[in-house]
Amino acid sequence: MKAVFFDLDDTLLWDEKSVRTTFAETCLQAEKKYGLAPEEFEAAVREAARELYMSYETYPYTVMIGINPFEGLWSNFSEPISEGFQKLNKIVPEYRRNAWTNGLKALGIDDPAYGEYLGEFFAAERRKRPFVYDETFAVLDQLKGKYELLLLTNGDPSLQKEKLAGVPELAPYFNEIVISGAFGKGKPDVSIFEHCLKLMNIEKDDAIMVGDNLNTDILGASRAGIKTVWINRTDKKNETDVKPDYIISSLHDLFPILEK
C-alpha cells in the first residue's frame, strides 16, 4: 500500500457537529424572539431548505458535484469556475433567506426580515465552528512520511478551502487535495477516483479510500477498484448494497489494515 485517500467531512472534520450546533444556536434566537421550540423549528427549516434546494434548476448540478442543501446555507459559491457555480452564486442569497423565512411560515410566523436575519446569523455562526475529531492529527502524524496522502472531498471549492483554512494545520499533511467542484464531477463518479490515481502516479491496488459515506466514498472507490475503509463511528446500520472492504469505528483502527 502506497497511498491513503481520505474524505474530509465527517471523516477528518466533524462537520455533523458543526452543522448541528450551528442550527441549535440559530434556532435559540428564534425561541427567544418568538417562543418557537428549537427542535421543531430546526426540522421545519431543514425541510424548507431541502424543498427549495430541489426546486432550483441548479439541483442536478449540485447532485453531480455532491453539494447538499445545508452547505448552501453558508456557502457563497464565490469561485465562478463553471456556469453551475455562477448560477449558484446568484441564487444563494435568496435561497438562504427563503429557507429560514419558509421555516418560520411553517410554524405560523410571517416575518421575511427576520428570516433574512437568521439566514445571515446561521452562515456567520457556522464559520465559527470548525470541529476536528480527536484522533485526526495523531493518525495523520503517524501516516505522514510512510504513505502518500490525498484528500478527496465533494463540494464547492471556495467552501471546502474555507473549511481547510479554518483548521490550517490540516492541509499540509496532504500531497494532493482534490475538490469535486474544481474537477467537475463528484464521488461516486469513477472518473474522480481515476483522476486521483493519476495525480499520485499509482495503480489502484496501491491505494485505499477512507470515508464515512457508503454512497459516495465507498461506492465510488469500489467501482474504481480501490480498496475501501468505511469509518462508522456511530455504529450505523448498512442499509445499502455497498460492501466496504473494511469497517472501523476510529481512525486508529486503520493501522492494522495498512500493515496487512
UniProtKB/Swiss-Prot annotation:
Which InterPro entries does the entry link to? HAD-like_hydrolase, HAD-like_sf, HAD-SF_hydro_IA, HAD_sf, PGP-like_dom2, PSP_YsaA
Task: Write out the entry's keywords from A to Z.
Answer: Amino-acid biosynthesis, Cobalt, Hydrolase, Magnesium, Serine biosynthesis
- What enzyme category does the UniProt record give? hydrolase
General remark: ysaA complements E.coli serB and vice versa.
Database matches in CDD domains: HAD_Neu5Ac-Pase_like (cd04305)
A GO MF term? phosphatase activity
Q: Which reaction does it catalyse?
A: O-phospho-L-serine + H2O = L-serine + phosphate; O-phospho-D-serine + H2O = D-serine + phosphate
The cofactor(s) it depends on are: Mg(2+); Co(2+)
Entry superkingdom: Bacteria
Consequences of knocking out this gene: Cells lacking this gene cannot grow in minimal medium, in contrast to wild type. ysaA, serA, and serC deletion mutants have virtually identical profiles when observed across all the conditions studied, likely placing YsaA in the serine biosynthesis pathway. The defect is complemented by glycine, or a combination of serine and other amino acids such as glutamine or glutamate. The inability of serine alone to rescue the growth defect of the deletion mutant is due to serine toxicity.
Q: What is this protein called?
A: Phosphoserine phosphatase
What is this protein for, i.e. what is its function?
Answer: Catalyzes the last step of the phosphorylated serine biosynthetic pathway, i.e. dephosphorylation of O-phospho-L-serine to form L-serine. To a lesser extent, is also able to dephosphorylate phosphothreonine, phosphoethanolamine, and histidinol phosphate in vitro.
Question: What metabolic or biological pathway is this protein involved in?
Answer: Amino-acid biosynthesis; L-serine biosynthesis; L-serine from 3-phospho-D-glycerate: step 3/3
The gene that this protein is the product of is: serB
User: Which N-terminal residues, if any, form the signal peptide?
Assistant: none
One GO biological-process annotation of the entry reads: L-serine biosynthetic process
| Family assignment from sequence similarity | Belongs to the HAD-like hydrolase superfamily.
Per the UniProt entry, the Enzyme Commission number(s) are 3.1.3.3
